[in-house]
């Protein structure tokens, strides 16, 4: 696999604990060709500042939002805002925790083009990655 085919996920906790060191490491990873995503976006100490200043390629919408968005209009509004904001910043968006077709359809209508969850596949052990169809690998972040 090429570095560009892999995503490195960084959590906000890592950023808070060691912001300068983490930033330097993210720059090095991106320079090496890896894609970097901010994981669990919307939870913890989410800050729009991270989106503006970090060398990242995208964000991952936390499953706590996608799991309840269809039943909670406020969460749905928050989820819908993330792809719009990301598009303005030229960032990709991955929605986590997609278990049902109606969730995926709603996310697609909101502008989310990548997703993870049991709707697509259960977690796969590293030794079985080579057995996945090639079409799944680019969106596996």
Q: Across the structure, where does each feature detected by a protein language model lie?
A:
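Conserved functional hotspot residues or short segments at active or partner-binding sites
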Residues: 25
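EAL-family c-di-GMP phosphodiesterase catalytic domain
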Residues: 5-20, 32-141
């Amino acid at each position: 696999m090429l570095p560009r085919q892999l995503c490195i996920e960084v959590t906000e906790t890592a950023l808070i604990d060691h912001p300068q060191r983490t930033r330097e490491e993210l720059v090095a990873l991106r320079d090496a060709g890896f894609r970097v995503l901010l994981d669990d976006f919307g939870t913890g100490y989410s800050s729009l500042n991270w989106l503006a200043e970090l060398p990242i390629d995208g964000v991952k919408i936390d499953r706590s939002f996608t799991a309840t968005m269809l039943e909670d209009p406020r969460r749905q509004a928050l989820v819908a805002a993330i792809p719009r904001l990301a598009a303005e910043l030229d960032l990709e968006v991955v929605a986590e925790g997609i278990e049902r077709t109606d969730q995926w359809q709603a996310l697609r209508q909101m502008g989310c083009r990548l997703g993870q969850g049991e709707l697509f596949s259960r977690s796969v052990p590293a030794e079985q990655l080579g057995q996945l169809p090639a079409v799944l690998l680019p969106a596996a972040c």
